[in-house]
Regions:
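Active-site acidic-Proline motif in GNAT/NAT acetyltransferases
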Residues: 83-85, 89, 117-118
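Short acidic-aromatic loop segments in the C-terminal HATPase_c
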Residues: 81, 131-132
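Short glycine-rich hinge loops at helix-strand junctions in the catalytic core
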Residues: 90, 107, 130
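C-terminal "cap" of GNAT-fold acetyltransferases
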Residues: 71-75, 109-123, 127-129, 135-155
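Acetyl-CoA-dependent GNAT
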Residues: 2-15, 20-85, 96-98, 102, ...
Length: 155
């Protein structure tokens, strides 16, 4: 999980950020200690997409206090990460559908996420799935404060 996390994050964000800020973020958020902490949180859930024996993507969702911004009766999609060579094969959509099924089973009111304002591909993906922007929040990548668009999908 550490390798796919770092690889997909670099592929998506390295072009718009400094090497120093990328390194700082990767070390803070994708260290083995941090990932173990996330996996052990009872309100966070991980689901993996495989092609043959290779993990090619994963989903991380949060409920309750595990959400990066606590929302009542909601499920946060924190990560839908798919390796570049497997994008466009409906893996991201399948992972999203898993998140939606979880939220519906738990009878939650909405699903939400934050997406970097400079990631038009992701914004278009979530808009096509029915998400609408409802707020913004700051996201720190290294020493750079960036803006995430918060998007939600009512259930």
């Amino acid at each position: 999980m550490q390798q796919i996390s770092k690889t997909t994050f670099i592929d998506t964000y390295a072009g718009g950020n400094t090497q120093e800020n990328m390194h700082a973020y990767l070390e803070a958020h994708f260290s083995l200690a941090q990932l173990k902490k996330e996996i052990s949180n009872p309100e966070s859930f991980f689901y993996f997409a495989r092609h043959k024996t290779q993990v090619v993507g994963y989903l991380k969702v949060n409920m309750g206090q595990a959400q990066s911004e606590t929302q009542k009766a909601a499920l946060e999609i924190e990560r839908i990460y798919v390796l570049k060579n497997f994008q466009g094969q409906h893996i991201g959509k399948t992972l999203f559908q898993k998140a939606l099924a979880i939220a519906q089973k738990k009878q939650l009111q909405f699903v939400w996420l934050g997406v970097w304002e400079n990631n038009p591909k992701a914004i278009a993906f979530y808009t096509a799935l029915g998400f609408i922007p409802y707020d913004k929040h700051l996201f720190k990548l290294g020493d750079d404060l960036q803006t995430d668009i918060m998007m939600r999908l009512e259930l």
